[in-house]
């Protein structure tokens, strides 16, 4: 028994109970902040003669406070609690004006602009408490046994509750009811840069395959969609599904669409989609709008340019094959409650979503302010155009109220200080997005894949039972890794990755 105690103590010296939250936040600050800036790249304006702003490196400061007399000095978490302040760091962003258009464009002087405040997670690398000994923590007014992993917003301790989510960019198969009939569905939550699109391929009882995705009213026959993406011949469509078992099914679909809609080329298919997404508009506009919808809303995780259309054709073919396999009994429905199909959105992931939204609002405001300066016959000034409270207030408001991007509520909660155990329990909580008012019997039950990951007993009674869960004591949450490294490694082994 003594050996077991030593082993457990040794484990928790290396892996803290709240490490998953702190590590996720550190990854957000060190990597994902810059990634969000790079996604935007430039701030384009409508200023005559050409004027845009190139965004560079983002710099994260240390927690400081600006006093009434204008002086700036470091602030500790305890002072933030006592004075009802937000424990945050200043953010600075390199911005370079580009004046002119085309070959005449020239870069101006790069300036480092203060863009707002970012709340700091206690215990993270940018916190004053990071790496401090027990004695130093006591001197700073902190409890050395405090797990940290929370924020201080307007003097109140707030914790971001881990959100359980279905895995993005993975095909799931299920049978669904449509107008009293059972259809076989292959669906994927295609996710890119915070945008989430549900794309489906369905086999209807008449044997025809249909697809749905955002931006497209109603269902569209899969054959027409593939042709619009560039599948010029029937052979291209058959090869994308690449399964001899379903050859006759695909031929039936191709023949049916040809007879009913008389669509024989990619141009015909684009025109068909254009009439759906831009009815009553000029032909050129309809075609352009159809291409835009296919680029941005159909499987965006594969890319958002026309060059990515072949990948989308191949992916749709795999989805169609999965739906047909489900219908003919070659595979069963996927178990949505299996933990292989779940992902935990930790503090870093939630902060990434929030910062991306807040930064997009700041970018819109900078564009507006620059254009307004020129209308008043002033020389555009980046420093004058940046209103830092835009970013700061949106982040603070979300963390203070718990209302998150996408309309989620209860993401940020008041830290439970009833007892030490209650605090640790709340910091290791994981919440399902399902409605509390619905039965969801299967989602609430224990699943075999919860073993070692989810505590089987710690869940509340009442409507939250089984939907509010807690990580098991020795559960360790891994972080998302960059797929490109794995792909390069596979290629080095001579494996064809397509």
UniProtKB/Swiss-Prot annotation:
It is found in: Cytoplasm. It is an enzyme of class 2 (transferase). SUPFAM superfamilies: beta and beta-prime subunits of DNA dependent RNA-polymerase (SSF64484). Keywords: Cytoplasm, DNA-binding, DNA-directed RNA polymerase, Nucleotidyltransferase, Transcription, Transferase. It catalyses: RNA(n) + a ribonucleoside 5'-triphosphate = RNA(n+1) + diphosphate. Belongs to the RNA polymerase beta chain family. This is DNA-directed RNA polymerase subunit Rpo2N. The gene is rpo2N.
